[in-house]
Amino acid sequence: MKVDKRKLEIAMARAKLNRDTLARKADMPIPTVCNVYSRGSCKPATVGRIAEALGIDVTEILAD
């Protein structure tokens, strides 16, 4: 799934999380979150876990 980096950054800022704390909250390795952030894509389950950790709907961080 394509993740919009800007939307992800905004959601992280709203939740007051950096990549490390997001990874811990999503219960996934830090490199996984960094890869999503840099590549802009990931598996549906991964984006779902990130959205859940941010307390948002997954559609809020998907690319248009």
Language-model features, listed with the residues they occupy:
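The alpha-helix within a helix-turn-helix
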Residues: 12, 23, 51
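Short C-terminal boundary/hinge segments that cap the last helix of small helical domains
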Residues: 55-64
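Key DNA-contacting residues within the recognition helix of helix-turn-helix
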Residues: 9, 34-35, 48, 62
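Recognition helix of helix-turn-helix/homeodomain-like DNA-binding domains
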Residues: 28-42
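A short, Lys/Arg-rich alpha-helix, primarily the initiator
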Residues: 1-20
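Short, basic-rich loop-to-helix N-cap that marks the start of a DNA-contacting helix
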Residues: 39-52
